[in-house]
């Protein structure tokens, strides 16, 4: 989820780096390995049978040397030939060896389509690790650094992040296969993604406070063509249908205990836009490659811009350069805050900020065929609670009630009108306006380039530790 550059943009409610965290039965053993194996070899482990056969052989021949009838030991005793003129002694009934029953292997749990199996069921022993990238400069772990990391990251930190990342991977790959197609409505895509996230996290978010345990990190962004960021379907708005000529950005967050994974991708059905998508994807990977402990954000931005703006595409017979969008940035992520206090531009800049050990960053880039600068559009993408403004002195009872609902269910997480109505909140428009007017809640508008242009976005979340970095949201798709 892109962070708009500082010009006229307050980072709160999720921009305060010092904000407080929001709590958030054994088988019988056979002689030769198994009963079935013994039968296959033609041997039955019963010593009395061999002794009986030796006695009968001596009685028939009168001596051990003359006229011996050879009995082949490899042939099972019950199949040996007996003379017809010799009365046979009744054979002992042999007990049939019971074949040991093989224990049924536990059936491996598999994800459904649409995804509805909670991730804790699929991965009872731990969640998949992201892409690990060692840093030669820092790939040593001393006792002091281990203690330092333990202060930064508690015992559940990595497990929470890896769970959130795997939820993101499974849901987005389902969306790419089944949801994102020409003719699909954007509301159906958003609902499909968000239903999947809530199901896999095991938290539907309908009970008070449940959404703070796990679920959506922010509303699903579905931005078409010149709309670059911060657009989501809203109740009562005109339905938007995805066209074959569209370029769609899909940006959504998943959190577990406030640890937010922020990752985004772009889909285009017309190959004319392939170079635009490739430029932005390569730019994001360049940013990830340059990111690390002590890396300067100015160096990262310059490297990203150089790669992205080396691409161009041909539209309607004209060569069009890809421009790095200059007033939206990547950002660090804090617990329950999608935007921390640090920004990572994708253009040359003079910032002196450095990345530090223990930090979490969303490395994202946006490219455009337009002017490469975004303006606020009409409408509202979502809302966020300003934690620095107390909810006191509100005259409207509906406003007091609404802010209690927001604090109890979203805390400092960004939410949308769809999320309020899902909780059964009604007639909230006047109350919301009152909260915004008092600075208690902030609203966020869609961000757009010029009409007729096309924009693309790719984004990953990375964790920085003493051994290097973990691209926690990396998948087979991007």
From Swiss-Prot:
Q: Where does substrate bind?
A: 230, 339
Q: Which GO terms describe its molecular function?
A: initiator methionyl aminopeptidase activity; metal ion binding; metalloaminopeptidase activity
Query: Its domain of life?
Result: Eukaryota
GO BP of this protein: proteolysis
Keywords noted in UniProt: Aminopeptidase, Cytoplasm, Hydrolase, Metal-binding, Protease
Extract the NCBIfam families matched here: met_pdase_II
Protein name, UniProt field = Methionine aminopeptidase 2-1
Q: Give the species this sequence originates from.
A: Aspergillus clavatus (strain ATCC 1007 / CBS 513.65 / DSM 816 / NCTC 3887 / NRRL 1 / QM 1276 / 107)
């Amino acid at each position: 989820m892109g962070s708009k550059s500082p010009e006229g943009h307050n980072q709160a409610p999720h921009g305060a780096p010092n904000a407080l965290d929001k709590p958030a039965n054994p088988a019988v053993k056979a002689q030769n390995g198994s009963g079935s194996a013994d039968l296959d070899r033609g041997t039955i482990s019963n010593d009395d049978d061999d002794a009986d056969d030796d006695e009968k052989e001596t009685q028939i021949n009168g001596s051990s040397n003359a006229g011996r009838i050879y009995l082949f030991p490899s042939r099972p005793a019950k199949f040996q030939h007996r003379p017809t003129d010799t009365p046979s002694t009744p054979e002992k009934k042999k007990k049939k060896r019971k074949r040991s029953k093989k224990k049924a292997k536990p059936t491996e749990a598999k994800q459904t389509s649409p995804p509805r199996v909670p991730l804790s069921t699929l991965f009872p022993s731990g969640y998949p690790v992201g892409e690990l990238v060692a840093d030669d400069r820092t790939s040593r772990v001393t006792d002091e650094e281990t203690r330092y990391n333990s202060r930064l990251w508690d015992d559940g930190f990595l497990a929470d992040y890896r769970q959130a990342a795997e939820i993101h991977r499974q849901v987005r790959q389902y969306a790419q296969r089944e949801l994102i197609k020409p003719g699909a409505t954007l509301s159906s895509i958003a609902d499909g993604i968000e239903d999947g996230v809530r199901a896999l996290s095991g938290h539907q978010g309908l009970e008070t406070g449940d959404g703070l345990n796990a679920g959506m990190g922010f509303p699903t962004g579905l931005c078409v063509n010149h709309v670059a960021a911060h657009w989501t379907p809203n109740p009562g708005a005109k339905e938007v249908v995805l066209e074959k000529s569209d370029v769609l950005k899909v940006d959504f967050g998943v959190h577990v205990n406030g640890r937010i994974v922020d990752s985004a991708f772009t889909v285009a059905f017309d190959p004319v836009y392939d170079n635009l998508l490739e430029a932005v994807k390569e730019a994001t990977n360049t940013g990830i490659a340059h990111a690390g402990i002590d890396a300067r954000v100015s160096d990262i931005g310059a490297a990203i811009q150089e790669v992205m703006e080396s691409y161009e595409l041909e539209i309607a017979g004209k060569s069009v350069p890809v421009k790095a969008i200059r007033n939206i940035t990547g950002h660090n992520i804090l617990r329950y805050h999608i935007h921390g206090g640090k920004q990572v531009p994708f253009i040359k800049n003079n910032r002196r900020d450095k990345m530090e050990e223990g930090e979490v960053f969303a490395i994202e880039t946006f490219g455009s065929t337009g002017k490469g600068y975004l303006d606020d559009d009409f409408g509202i993408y979502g809302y966020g609670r300003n934690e620095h403004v107390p909810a006191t002195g509100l005259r409207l009872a509906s406003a007091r009630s609404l802010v209690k609902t927001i604090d109890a269910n979203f805390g400092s997480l960004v939410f949308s009108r769809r999320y309020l109505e899902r909780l059964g909140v009604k007639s909230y428009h006047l109350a919301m306006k009152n909260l915004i007017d008092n600075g208690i809640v902030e609203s966020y508008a869609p961000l757009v380039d010029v009409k007729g242009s096309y924009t693309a976005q790719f984004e990953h979340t990375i964790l920085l530790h003493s051994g290097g970095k973990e691209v926690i949201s990396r998948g087979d798709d991007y």
